[in-house]
């Protein structure tokens, strides 16, 4: 197995759904299924914050979600927890700046997908040099899902990454909705990552379909 190519990674980032049990008001397994039917291209398991599952329950829930992703042939990524990603033989892991260092993550994950959240050009360059396959850049817009976010960057912040010669695949993160998706892609992102735009939508299926349409229209 070799590392994923830039072109393949770029395609996978199109509509990146992130979810944990506490991000849904409906059955999360049903929400994920609808999102997959609607066309998400990659999924990240992020079980964090108030009311999040822990221990064995968390692992069992992750396995259920992973099995559904497998049915649809969509990569299953674990947020932050490298050990869980290895235990589940997940397709990859996504880490932030305060999580385990990228060098040791890459070492442990082998050729699997490694994504890194970055807020500055320096962080981006460090992540690229040490084995990141893609960057999560944001928050682009204000978000209520994550309580520990850095300052909002806007689409200008994202465009700045491209202007500074960062060519690695980038997914925009933070406060992204159907209405503002086009502006994120136009600023230079390969895709958008969303939580509530899908998890809290009246129809997760319809919402995903609209996101997919917006991304392909703007690319």
Swiss-Prot record:
| Gene Ontology CC annotations of this record | cytoplasm
| InterPro entries tied to this protein | Aldolase_TIM, ThiamineP_synth_sf, ThiamineP_synth_TenI, TMP_synthase
Keywords linked to the UniProt accession: Magnesium, Metal-binding, Thiamine biosynthesis, Transferase
Which co-factor is required? Mg(2+)
Q: Which reaction does this chain catalyze?
A: 2-[(2R,5Z)-2-carboxy-4-methylthiazol-5(2H)-ylidene]ethyl phosphate + 4-amino-2-methyl-5-(diphosphooxymethyl)pyrimidine + 2 H(+) = thiamine phosphate + CO2 + diphosphate; 2-(2-carboxy-4-methylthiazol-5-yl)ethyl phosphate + 4-amino-2-methyl-5-(diphosphooxymethyl)pyrimidine + 2 H(+) = thiamine phosphate + CO2 + diphosphate; 4-methyl-5-(2-phosphooxyethyl)-thiazole + 4-amino-2-methyl-5-(diphosphooxymethyl)pyrimidine + H(+) = thiamine phosphate + diphosphate
- Give the enzyme's EC designation: 2.5.1.3
Q: Write one Gene Ontology MF term.
A: magnesium ion binding
Q: Which Pfam families does the record associate with it?
A: TMP-TENI
Q: Which residues bind 2-[(2R,5Z)-2-carboxy-4-methylthiazol-5(2H)-ylidene]ethyl phosphate?
A: 143-145, 175, 195-196
* Positions with a binding annotation for Mg(2+): 80, 99
Q: What's a single GO BP term from this record?
A: thiamine biosynthetic process
Tell me which residues bind 4-amino-2-methyl-5-(diphosphooxymethyl)pyrimidine. Answer: 44-48, 79, 117, 146
Q: Cross-referenced CDD domains, in alphabetical order? A: TMP_TenI (cd00564)
- The source's superkingdom equals Bacteria
Co-factor: note: Binds 1 Mg(2+) ion per subunit.
Give the metabolic or biological pathway: Cofactor biosynthesis; thiamine diphosphate biosynthesis; thiamine phosphate from 4-amino-2-methyl-5-diphosphomethylpyrimidine and 4-methyl-5-(2-phosphoethyl)-thiazole: step 1/1
The UniProt family comment states: Belongs to the thiamine-phosphate synthase family.
Q: What does this protein do?
A: Condenses 4-methyl-5-(beta-hydroxyethyl)thiazole monophosphate (THZ-P) and 2-methyl-4-amino-5-hydroxymethyl pyrimidine pyrophosphate (HMP-PP) to form thiamine monophosphate (TMP).
Report what the protein is called.
Thiamine-phosphate synthase
Question: Which gene underlies this protein?
Answer: thiE
